[in-house]
Regions:
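Soluble non-cytosolic domains of exported or imported proteins
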Residues: 2-3, 28-29, 73, 146-153
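Conserved beta-sheet core of the metallophosphoesterase superfamily
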Residues: 30-84
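Active-site-proximal beta-strand/loop segments in catalytic clefts of secreted hydrolases
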Residues: 23-27, 50-53, 70-73, 159, ...
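Solvent-exposed loop/linker segments at secondary-structure transitions
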Residues: 13, 32, 36, 46, ...
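Generic structural signal for well-ordered alpha-helices
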Residues: 2-10, 77, 156
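Short, Asp-centered acidic motifs that coordinate Mg2+ and/or phosphate
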Residues: 18-21, 45-46, 66, 170
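Gly/Ser/Thr-rich active-site loops/lids in small-molecule metabolic enzymes
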Residues: 1-4, 74, 193-199
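Short acidic, glycine-rich surface-loop motifs adjacent to enzyme active sites
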Residues: 5-31
């Protein structure tokens, strides 16, 4: 990755870029290796990365670009402010948690409602109830990727009972397949299944 990143940085430098940053989806260790390119390319200021799914920051210095990663499912973001002046470029960043304390922008809500309506036109059963959870089912990433969870157990039970002839004795599923990263409570809907198997 480092060699390819340096080729791209050199191209941006040749094009006269005022600032260069990386947008990646790599392991933190790989991002840190790429960040060291700042030593030879001082216009390379920061990397915004993904992959780990947890908020992370590796602070840079004169020879290393900053590396910032937000949480999965847009639960945390980094606000990055860049100031250009005759004296150079200044970059500052702030971690922002996206939670109930932030009001939903009405203009955004109109757009979200429009697209949800289009989804329901294409898949009218998406909001349909397929079951009921008397106990909240834990589909959070921290649970399904680190041990047994009742949501993972529920999914595996559905898989096992789907095979009747011959009957399956057991079923298991890789926790990384379960992408909902949330609790499922009360009505279980097709939407919950769609959010769980986001890549299907």
């Amino acid at each position: 990755y480092v060699q390819k990143a340096e080729q791209i940085i050199e191209q941006f430098e040749a094009d006269g870029a005022d600032l260069i940053f990386g947008l990646t989806h790599l392991h933190l260790a790989s991002d840190i290796e790429i960040a060291k390119l700042k030593r030879r390319h001082p216009m390379f200021k920061f990397i915004v990365g993904g992959h780990e799914h947890e908020v992370q920051r590796h602070s840079g210095d004169a020879n290393t670009a900053d590396v910032m990663k937000g949480a999965s499912n847009a639960r945390t973001i980094w606000q990055i402010d860049v100031t250009f002046s005759a004296g150079g470029t200044e970059v500052s960043s702030q971690q922002i948690d996206i939670d109930q304390s932030i009001a939903i922008d009405p203009e955004y809500q109109v757009i979200a409602d429009k697209w949800r309506g289009k989804l329901l036109e294409l898949v009218p059963f998406f909001a349909s109830r397929i079951g009921y959870a008397a106990t909240p089912l834990d589909g959070r990433e921290a649970s399904v990727r680190n041990g047994d969870s009742n949501w993972g157990g529920f999914i595996a039970d559905q898989m096992r009972t789907a095979f009747r002839d011959p009957p399956a004795d057991l079923a298991f599923i890789n926790g990384g397949t379960l992408r909902i990263d949330d609790f499922v409570a009360d009505d279980i809907t097709f939407e919950d299944i769609g959010r769980t198997f986001g890549f299907s």
